[in-house]
Amino acid sequence: LRQQADKPKGQPNFSLADFVAPKESGRVDYVGGFACTAGPEVHDLARHFEEKHDDYSALIVKALGDRFAEAFAERLHKWARDQWEFGLTENLTSEEIIREKYRGIRPAPGYPACPDHTEKWELFKLLDATNHTGISLTESLAMFPASSVSGLYFAHPEAKYFAVGKLDRDQIHDYATRKNMEPTEAERWLRPYLNYDPDSVLTKPCLPGAKVESMV
């Protein structure tokens, strides 16, 4: 998916694909994947407090669980950078790590740079994530346990976070074709990002010979 908003001259419309060497370049490049969790114990302990009507303690447990999962993801990212070797020369303070001053990014499906939650299906398949971590995906593609993180590692020195923003019908249909998915299915998962109303007859593509009458 690529940004489609009009930008000032000289400013590119980003896609995460920009940070991976194209196949035709002949260059060897890699993208990493990860999935980690603070474990089911976070859910169980929070449930324990909820059953005792101690909502405050339940909230604290969930918040700590989320922080542990994010810290785990941060540690895994450091390990990945070390495997790529450029991380071995890092000498960052805790504040610089929090501000993500290192090289590379780790976007997650469902977030602004990669808004399609269905990418988790392929990621979990490649990692065999459920067997290795115990993390499962719900029907809405949320992760369970909730204190879990998954995503991709990009090593490109100019990789940056961005928001894809609103998407037009042409890109949605092209994207659906490349994912071997029905356009209506892609629209369902990406609905918050659509720059059109998929239910409106005025925005639906017409078949040859079809007529659209104005309702104004």
Residue ranges of predicted features:
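Active-site loops and adjacent core secondary-structure elements that bind or stabilize anionic groups
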Residues: L1-L59, A63, R81, F86-L88, ...
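Structural beta-strand/beta-sheet cores of well-ordered domains, especially the beta-sheet scaffolds
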Residues: Y30-F34, L64, T133, S150, ...
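Generic structural signal for hydrophobic core residues of well-folded globular domains
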Residues: T37-A38, F72, K179
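Acidic, metal/cofactor-coordinating or nucleic-acid-engaging core segments within structured domains
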Residues: L64-D66, E70-W79
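Compositionally biased, low-complexity/repeat regions
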Residues: K78-T177, P183-T184, R188-R191, L202
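Acidic, low-complexity intrinsically disordered tails
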Residues: M181-P183, E187, Y196-V216
